[in-house]
Amino acid sequence: MSIRQLSIQWKISLLSGLCLLSIVALLVGLSLYRMDHTTQLVEASSTQMLNESGKARIEAQGEAQALAISRQFMDAYQYGNGFARQVLFLREQSEKRFLDAFDLREDLTRQVKAALQANPDLLGLSLVFEANALDNKDALFDHQKELGSNDKGRFSLYWSQPTPGTLTSMALPEADLADTSTGPSGQANNSWFSCPRETLKPCIIEPYFYKIDGQKVLMTSIVFPLLVNGKLIASLSVDINLNSLQALSKLASKELYEGQADVSIVSSAGILAGFSKDVSKLAQRLDQVDVKNGAQLIKLMATGDQPQSLHGHERLKIVTPFKPIPGSKPWGVLLDVP
């Protein structure tokens, strides 16, 4: 039977049925589309949550490492600050009691040795007075190394302990105090001496290599100005062996992503104080080791005290800034994960 032979009522019913069928099909299609779209949104949201969760875990690791390193620096800072006050007190008492210059220098030599011996975590301790600022008798003590006096008679004593309990001493020569040649960081080689003189504030020196007992040691120094009535009379330097930071970076690398993460400890000038991937890169600039991202990471580190991240080439790099001593520019712990 053709459609022309159908009654008007049947035609209306058929048309209504077709319309209803079309509406049902449309609703089903829209429902399927929405389900698919919702699934995509859920998957995207889940992926984002997983990424954010992973990033948060990495940031937490970086903050934990930064805190541990900060404590090491602060321990050295507080110890050096306390000993600086002790030296000032000793000098003040010597003036009041008219202590003989020989006895004063001998006593200071013993005091510096004892202070270092009492703290096996420190690599070295130096005390350098301004010319004639100790007893105004430098000329009587030139080349008397056993009394901490250098080639000009200046009290310029350095005690070191390459291994805990093994101590050696030397009088730092005038040539070392005047060495303004620069290293990879751009700082002068005598910045451990010149920085507190110029700023009259405690300084932390960029990582540098120094030979101690014939061994090349990567170290940094926290240096304190000794002031009397606002005038600088001496500089005290506390030396820290950075081998501990290299060991820390390697240990952290093993614990992150089954050893696939690279961990670096970076100074304010971008010098590598720890680099789990390659020990031979220590004391080099991060922007030379990581040509693509190094400069940007150094800038991110300098922005403040919050972790900063950088994505690229299927790697996530998170740098966590920290201040090694009060008032210093930030250093950073850099985690590089796949």
Language-model region placement:
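Short, Lys/Arg-rich, polar N-terminal cytosolic tail immediately upstream
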Residues: 1-5
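Juxtamembrane extracytoplasmic/periplasmic/luminal helical "stalk" adjacent to the first N-terminal
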Residues: 9-13, 17-123, 202
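Extracytoplasmic/secreted envelope proteins and their assembly/folding machinery
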Residues: 59, 77, 109-113, 190-193, ...
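Amphipathic alpha-helical bundle/coiled-coil segments
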Residues: 70, 185-190, 239, 267, ...
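Solvent-exposed, extracytoplasmic
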Residues: 107-115, 209-211, 235, 239-281
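Extracellular/periplasmic ligand-sensing ectodomains of membrane signal-transduction proteins
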Residues: 117-201, 207-214, 272-291
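PAS/PAS-like sensory domains
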Residues: 199-205, 259, 302-308
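Extracellular/periplasmic juxtamembrane segments that couple receptor/chemosensory ectodomains to their
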Residues: 222-234, 238-240, 268, 280, ...
